[in-house]
Swiss-Prot record:
GO terms for molecular function: mRNA binding. InterPro entries: KH_dom, KH_dom_type_1, KH_dom_type_1_sf. The keyword Repeat applies. The lineage of its organism: Eukaryota, Metazoa, Chordata, Craniata, Vertebrata. Residues 1-11 have a biased composition (Polar residues). PANTHER family: SCP160, VIGILIN. SUPFAM superfamilies: Eukaryotic type KH-domain (KH-domain type I) (SSF54791). This is Vigilin.
Length: 1270
């Protein structure tokens, strides 16, 4: 069985030979109409044999039969491969083997859908569905891979091969697709003319036919070259090319005459052979006729007048040729010859000669003497002065030669005389009222004379109304020229020389200052460096970038000022170095607050008197602290003695000096001071001071109370003696929680071991990595004895015992408050001992159980007993502070209260917050400034008594409670008011409050800004500790100054200027993608606004410039300069065949942009739908426009040749029925339709296999004709 579905008539005709026995269904018809109408069966083939019978459903033809079907985007074609041409014949089952793989590969490559079926004769039918392009590609693949291939050759002339290939090989590819063949064309360097075709027989025949058709078409056309002497070309072309144009129009032949600038004699003819022969004959006739009749005469014309004879674009020569029929031959421009040859008929040469002399003498050249420096004044701003002359006399050309003292005028004689008189008057006037001066200034100073953005030179120009020309840097010239009013020139010259003299006296000096001092010299917010710059205003001081880690500070300015500034800064640095000497002063913990004083009064006084910086220590739990003092060495040392004297006076301190060799000092101090620290801790309240390293001094100073200095002195001396004789070290390990117990309270336990053995025992500090390592140092005997004692202590700590003691139940709460903090401290201090309080509810047990190492338990019991004694002696006092300050006093997460509690060993309890305080109209003020409160009832409350919510309870020993009360009262915040203009409030607050938050965090205060509704209020409230208020106020006022400066700058920047510019120039000022206007905006830092085209209320010629006044004026001048250049431009329309527009423009406009950039012109092509599609407008300077037009006309001539060839090829490729399509359509006609004939055929025999053929194998009854859908 075979079934086909063909959508195009070409496909039907192509495969008809292989499907003669098959019934064909045509689903789309070709648009061509033939003379003989098709039969009904040809037009409407029945469905395949196995399909349900549709004949009964056929309707008679009616009006609908005349409507032609619309072509579908998806088409279906069927290809039949006969058994003898199949590549793969051995198939056991349908769809298996190599054939199935090839079909899958074709579907993947092309995107088309393939279905295979086998006919009874084992021929292969392939149905291909998809888009037309995909179907054609699949067809080519099927023929190449599933059908055996044949090959044939066809011979055509070698010159016709390129027409078979087509542009970029497109025609060859299309031919291969249509014929499903492979066509091989020999290479250009191969002399063979044989073209090889590979494919099916039908495809080869069709391809061969198409190739021969192309060759035959080219045989009809011919190209001929005729050699004609160059001098006779003008006669053949005729005036303005009229003669050759008429000839081309009459004969339909294309004639190419080389232009006069090209030294070629060949004239090329292209066209149909007969018409071409006519054109060649007519040209030969003209040539022979002119050769016989013409003669020549030679005349001498000045070389400078040749261009007048030629005229613009050769118009004068064409004019003479048209009037007289005489050709005028002008020697080339690079030739020195002045001979002009006239060629023509003798009787017309006289008239032509008259015309030549008339053209030559119609123009004259004249020159006016004028100093070259006056040229630009004669031209005027944007050529305004010169334009007055050229507008009156447009044919005149005025030329200024740089460096020459003359002005050349060229044009009609009368116009030149008038222009010469006007220029002479202008020159005389300018010489009387202008002057110039030249000065020599080293070019390295030129940019300083110009100033930033031309500030200096523009000021001089505006002030003295002069023009100053400073040569560019690349010229390396020292000459500066000043031109303008005589008095202004002299004043400008004087000022420029003064500036240059000052700069020559200027010098640059590098100052070496350590980077660590840079920030100090600059000062907070640049205050100190501002003072230096105010003191030396002519000196520029440049500090290096902090990231560069450079010590070089650069000073630039007048020599004397730089020297003074250098000495001043060197002195400042010397003071900083001198004041950077620092020393640590050890003080005993108990005297710390006495030396600092209440509220830091004492230490502040010491700072002011000594002019030094003193850093206070942290509040760590050490027995002694270090004050860090920084300033002059001598002052710091005196200050150290002064602080130590205060301490000595307070505690009656004794100073003892011990002589220890300096070489042993480092060993005695130990790594990071560990060893000497252990001695000081052991002796308690002792300071040991070593001399500075490298001093060579052997004196070690010990400061201690009168009765305690002997022991540290003895320890130091003993250790030094042992070190000199013998030293022995042993490491011991113990759990960190045992260390405190091993040391004992106040170092009692470890002191006992040291006294017994004489060994030094060093425990790890919190900074050491190994927290279990204990080091024992001394003689071997002492170290071993100390090791035994410590090991025994550690062993005892490992032996856990349980003990109990009696504690009054009223004190139990003290041990468990704050999540059992007291119990945790006892456990940490005494080797992790566990203390358990009674938990039985309803009983008042006083028994407390302790569990741990025996020694630890005993020590813990002693500590608990001490705590109980303190609780028995505890008192409670009240501190009245208004509740509104409680949160501030507590600090973040209660940190301030926790610190006071630790420092003074007291407990502090704040009252509950009062949820609904009774309203008080006028709260009474107490003498201490606290607000009065009311009682619970609000009636009987004493106005003078404090409110309950204001009372803070402090518990502890009386003296400690009083000290804690003073510390609390010192934390009460103070409020001050600062006056700030209301309009600055929103800037101080910042975006989403960021500005005010930053200030509050920086100065640790609360800043309250009045609400926006209170517009009359300028008061900002600052609340915080007294010490922070001054800094906060200064910071706020500094911010106000910055904001006011910004406001002034905004006002200056809002200056507006309006420029009147014709709207037609706006696109040029804006530039491509806004490039020109963006450059002006960026260069002058201004905003430029163009009028809105859609807004009729706006003046369309007004451009608004906003910015600083000077910048706005400079931007205006830049815009007017562009406008001046645009006004000098001209626009010319040139007729350019619209068919070559696309090629001249190029891909994405690249080609036309290149032409515009080369000739500096603007070229505009007509838009689609324009009245004249060939009109192209060229805009630019006159000489550039002429050159650009000549260039694009040459391109047109070159590209039109290709256009003509392409059009001729397209005409050939069109179907032959083009002319027949003009005949009115007869409608759709078929012959032998069933509705028009009597059906005498008998019904088919259902049992006949001839009428109803079937597949060889049994198949399912519902199988579709083309197999299952995939």
């Amino acid at each position: 069985m075979s079934s086909v579905a063909v959508l195009t008539q070409e496909s039907f005709a192509e495969h008809r030979s292989g499907l003669t026995q098959q019934q064909v269904k045509v689903t789309a018809l070709n648009s061509e109409e033939e003379n003989d109408p098709p039969t009904y069966k040809e037009a409407f083939p029945p469905l395949p044999e196995k399909a349900p019978c549709l004949e009964a459903a056929q309707e008679p033809s009616g009006p609908w039969s005349k409507i032609r079907p619309i072509k579908a985007s998806v088409i279906t074609q069927v290809f039949h491969v006969p058994l003898e041409e199949r590549k793969y014949k051995d198939m056991n089952q349908f769809g298996e083997g190599e054939q199935a793989k090839i079909c899958l590969d074709i579907m993947q490559k092309t995107g088309a859908h393939l279905e295979l079926s086998l006919a009874k004769d084992q021929g292969l039918s392939i149905m291909v569905s998809g888009k037309l392009e995909a179907v054609m590609k699949a067809r080519k693949e099927i023929v190449a891979r599933l059908q055996t291939q044949a090959s044939a050759t066809v011979a055509i002339p070698k010159e016709h091969h390129r027409f078979v290939i087509g542009k970029n090989g497109e025609k060859l590819q299309d031919l291969e697709l249509k014929t499903a063949t492979k066509i091989q064309i020999p290479r250009p360097d191969d002399p063979s003319n044989q073209i090889k075709i590979t494919g099916t027989k039908e495809g080869i025949e069709k391809a061969r036919h198409e190739i021969l058709l192309i060759s035959a078409e080219q045989d009809k056309r011919a190209v001929e070259r005729l050699d004609v002497e160059k001098v006779y070309h003008p006669f053949i072309a005729g005036p303005y090319n009229k003669l050759v144009s008429e000839l081309m129009q009459d004969t339909g032949t294309r004639i190419n005459i080389p232009p006069p600038s090209v030294n070629k004699t060949e004239i090329v003819f292209t066209g149909e052979k007969e018409q071409l022969a006519q054109a060649v004959a007519r040209v030969k006739k003209i040539y022979e006729e002119k050769k016989k009749k013409t003669t020549t005469i030679a005349v001498e014309v000045k070389k400078s007048q040749h261009k007048y004879v030629i005229g613009r674009k050769g118009n004068s020569l064409q004019e003479i040729l048209e009037k007289t029929g005489v050709s005028v031959e002008i020697p080339p421009t690079d030739s020195s010859s002045e001979t002009v040859i006239l060629r023509g008929e003798p009787e017309k040469l006289g008239q032509a000669l008259t015309e030549v002399y008339a053209k030559a003498n119609s123009f004259t050249v004249s020159s006016v003497s004028a100093p070259s420096w006056l040229h630009r004044f004669i031209i005027g701003l944007f050529g305004q002065n010169l334009a007055k002359i050229t507008q009156q006399m447009p044919k005149i050309h005025i030329e200024f030669t740089e460096g020459e003292d003359k002005i050349t005028s060229e044009g009609p004689t009368e116009d030149v005389n008038v222009a010469q008189e006007q220029i002479e008057v202008m020159v005389k006037d300018l010489i009387n009222r202008t002057d110039y001066a030249e000065i020599n200034v080293d070019h390295k100073f030129h940019r300083h004379l110009i100033g930033k953005n031309g500030a200096n030179i523009n000021r001089i120009k505006d002030l003295y109304k002069v023009s100053v020309r400073i040569p560019p840097d690349n010229e390396k010239s020292n000459l500066i020229r000043i031109e303008g009013d005589p008095q202004g020139v002299q004043q400008a010259k004087k000022e420029l020389l003064e500036l240059a003299s000052r700069m020559e006296n200027e010098r640059t000096k590098d100052l070496i200052i350590e980077q660590k001092f840079h920030r100090t010299i600059i000062g907070q917010k640049g205050e100190r460096i501002r003072e230096i710059r105010e003191k030396f205003p002519e000196v520029i001081i440049n500090f290096p970038d902090p990231a560069h880690k450079s010590d070089i500070v650069q000073l630039r300015g007048p020599k004397n000022e730089v020297e003074k500034c250098t000495k001043y800064m060197q002195k400042m640095v010397a003071d900083l170095v001198e004041n950077s000497f620092s020393i640590s002063v050890p003080i005993f913990k108990q005297f710390h607050k006495n030396i600092i004083g209440k509220g830091g009064a004492n230490i502040k006084k010491i700072r002011e008197e000594s002019n030094t910086k003193i850093d206070l220590p942290g509040r760590e739990q050490a027995t002694q602290r270090q004050l860090l003092s920084q300033g002059r060495e001598q002052t710091v040392k005196l200050l150290r003695h002064r602080i130590l004297a205060i301490q000595k006076e307070l505690a009656n301190i004794t100073e003892v000096e011990v002589s220890i060799p300096s070489k042993l000092h480092n060993s005695l101090i130990g790594a990071k001071g560990r060893f000497i620290r252990s001695i000081m801790e052991e002796c308690g309240g002792v300071h040991i001071h070593f001399p500075t390293e490298g001093s060579g001094s052997a004196t070690v100073t010990i400061r201690a109370q009168p009765r305690t200095w002997r022991k540290p002195r003895s320890s130091c001396c003993t250790w030094a003696e042992e070190k000199q004789t013998k030293s022995y070290t042993v490491d011991l390990r113990a759990k960190p929680e045992y260390h405190k117990f091993l040391i004992g309270k106040g170092g009692g336990n470890i002191r006992k071991v040291r006294d017994n053995t004489g060994a030094r025992i060093i425990f790890p500090t919190s900074e050491d990595k190994d927290q279990e390592l204990i080091t024992i140092m001394g003689t071997e005997e002492a170290v071993k004895e100390a090791q035994k004692e410590l090991e025994a202590l550690i062993k005892n700590l490992d032996n856990v015992v349980e003990d109990s003691m009696v504690v009054d139940p009223k004190h139990h709460r003290h041990f468990v408050i704050r999540r059992g903090q007291v119990l945790r401290e006892i456990a940490d201090e005494y080797g992790g001992v566990m203390v358990r309080l009674p938990t039985v509810s309803g009983t008042q047990s006083d028994k407390v159980t302790l569990k741990g190492a025996k020694d630890c338990v005993e020590a813990a019991k002693k500590r608990i007993q001490e705590i109980i004694e303190d609780l028995e002696a505890q008192v409670t006092i009240e501190c009245t502070i208004p509740q509104k300050f409680h949160r501030s006093i507590m600090g973040p997460k209660g940190s301030r209260i926790q610190q006071i509690t630790r420092d003074y060993g007291v407990q502090i309890k704040f009252p509950d917050r009062e949820e609904n305080p009774a309203p008080v109209a006028e709260p009474a003020l107490q003498e201490n400034g606290e607000e009065g409160g009311e009682g619970k009832d609000g009636k009987d409350a004493d106005p003078s008594s404090p409110r309950k919510c204001d009372i803070i309870i402090i518990s502890g020993r009386r003296e400690k409670c009083e000290a804690a009360k003073e510390a609390l009262q010192a934390l009460v915040p103070v409020t001050i008011e600062v006056e700030v203009p209301f309009d600055l409030h929103r800037y101080i607050i910042g975006q989403k409050g960021s500005g005010i938050r930053k200030m509050m965090d920086e100065f640790e205060v609360n800043i309250q800004v009045p609400a926006p509704e209170l517009q009359s209020s300028d008061i900002i409230t600052i609340t915080g500790l007294a010490a922070n208020l001054d800094r906060a106020k200064a910071g706020l006022l500094e911010r106000v100054k910055e904001l006011q400066a910004e406001q002034e700058d905004r006002a200056l920047r809002s200056f507006k200027l309006t420029v009147t510019v014709d709207p037609k120039y706006h696109p040029k000022i804006i530039g491509r993608k806004g490039a020109v206007i963006t450059q002006i905006r960026t260069e002058h830092e201004v905003n430029i606004q163009f009028p809105d085209k859609d807004d009729e209320s706006q003046a369309q010629d007004q451009i608004t410039i906003t910015g600083y006044e000077k910048n706005a004026e400079a931007a205006r001048d830049a815009i007017m300069k562009i406008v001046g250049e645009l006004e000098q431009m001209v626009s010319e329309d040139v007729t350019l065949d619209h068919r070559v527009h696309a090629r001249i423009i190029g891909a994405r406009g690249k080609a036309i942009r290149k032409i515009m950039d080369e000739f500096k012109v603007d070229i505009r092509f007509p838009q689609s739908g324009a009245p004249d599609p060939n009109c192209v407008t060229v805009t630019g300077l006159p000489e550039n426009v002429e050159e650009a037009i000549d260039h694009i006309l040459n391109l047109e001539e070159e590209y039109l040749a290709d256009v003509v060839d392409n059009e001729a090829m397209q005409v050939y490729m069109k179907p032959s029925s083009h002319e027949e399509s003009k005949v009115p359509s007869k409608g759709f006609v078929v012959r032998d339709a069933p509705c028009g004939t009597v059906n005498n055929e008998k019904a088919p025999d259902m049992s006949s296999s001839e009428d109803f053929p079937s597949f060889g194998a049994q198949v399912a009854p519902k199988t579709l004709p083309w197999g299952p859908k995939r």
